[in-house]
Amino acid sequence: MKRSAQLVFVPAPGIGHIVSTVEMAKQLVARDDQLFITVLVMKLPYDQPFTNTDSSISHRINFVNLPEAQLDKQDTVPNPGSFFRMFVENHKTHVRDAVINLLPESDQSESTSKPRLAGFVLDMFSASLIDVANEFEVPSYVFFTSNSSTLALLSHFQSLRDEGGIDITELTSSTAELAVPSFINPYPVAVLPGSFLDKESTKSTLNNVGRYKQTKGILVNTFLELESHALHYLDSGVKIPPVYPVGPLLNLKSSHEDKGSDILRWLDDQPPLSVVFLCFGSMGSFGDAQVKEIACTLEHSGHRFLWSLRQPPSKGKRALPSDYADLKTVLPEGFLDRTATVGRVIGWAPQAAILGHPAIGGFVSHCGWNSTLESIWNGVPIAAWPMYAEQNMNAFQLVVELGLAVEIKMDYRKDSDVVVSAEDIERGIRQVMELDSDVRKRVKEMSEKSKKALVDGGSSYSSLGRFIDQI
């Protein structure tokens, strides 16, 4: 009889990383009844502790909230990449201690012992924890919560640096276009991921990616039909471990539990495909001037709207956006009254449930990868307005490479002083809400493919099976 095995997952902090990690764990234990998973949760100083509220999660998935690591007590940090590298490093002891508690005791019989430790599955940003896995003499795997195009881009840049001595940051202020093997079209420097905008972040990012070569495989939250070009490139002899596309990994259960909310009841009263939904992720927010441009657009667009509007943290402070105590303090005077019959402005939004509602006709999005997959799953076209991290690259892929989105401003950066005009926003909303557009047709087709990928015989189902076979 096969002995049970334990995998240790260490997601990066942040709800997007944790949610997709939990979905990955659920897929694995559903496929193999001898597999146990422990998720070690690292908490950012300004974030809430993680609590599992999903009663359907298997008893073979266990969560451990790690003690908070001792960090610099200052509210500001000069470089996010440096902060996160230090954050992960400072958790090594806590990860090690947690894993020791999972190990079988040597005097236990095989029939009563804990599952054998089979490996670590580390978040894409936490490759330095390979050192801890090596101490326990077990293999490491990477769980890449973004897309395979990002993985391919990072691997390509890492090779350019290490083998060709090329410094990508020297191009960031130019209007150059790059030949990147994982893309069909020339790739504009203006939409590079945010981690390549300065030398220190670039060094940290590429060093982290370089360590992927020490792992036994890379799980990616994508599916072959969506990213065939990038996945074929990664499978063509690139110096990288085997890549397993296993997505889309989405928490669809939570969307069903939100059915009774006021927001969804309001959507029930709207015609099919009539509402444009604006939402910019757990870290997305705008300054007052940009909020007023969006409000002006929505008031004059002629479309019904649902707008998730969050208040940015104080400038320079390490914190997440929050809900406004009073929306009238940031919106134009009288806006809420004038738009009361056609729109709703809310704080936090149950995004997955909203995107699954038949009234939603388009999604103005930051192009975070989880949000992108949710939108594709539900067949909702995107108007791309990226803000940070790899979202600019995601927008380029969706708009230019795949034709699954329209552009609002592909090269927008959250920390810039640029204010996107009402005219540009209105153009994007008008295009994304077109009922007979080619973009909408392509998204509908990709939606069907995303669902087929996960069922028996589908591309991601088969890929996950290959991963399980070699644990």
UniProtKB/Swiss-Prot annotation:
UDP-alpha-D-glucose binds at residues 282, 348-349, 366-374, 388-391. InterPro entries: UDP-glycosyltransf_plant (IPR050481), UDP_glucos_trans (IPR002213), UDP_glycos_trans_CS (IPR035595). The keyword Glycosyltransferase applies. Pfam families: UDPGT. Optimum temperature is 30 degrees Celsius. One of its GO terms (molecular function) is UDP-glucosyltransferase activity. Keywords: Glycosyltransferase, Transferase. Optimum pH is 6.75. Belongs to the UDP-glycosyltransferase family. Glycosyltransferase that possesses chalcone and flavonol 2'-O-glycosyltransferase activity. Converts phloretin to phlorizin (phloretin 2'-O-glucoside), a potent antioxidant. Possesses glycosyltransferase activity toward eriodictyol, apigenin, luteolin, kaempferol, quercetin, isoliquiritigenin, butein and caffeic acid. This is UDP-glycosyltransferase 71A16. It comes from Pyrus communis.
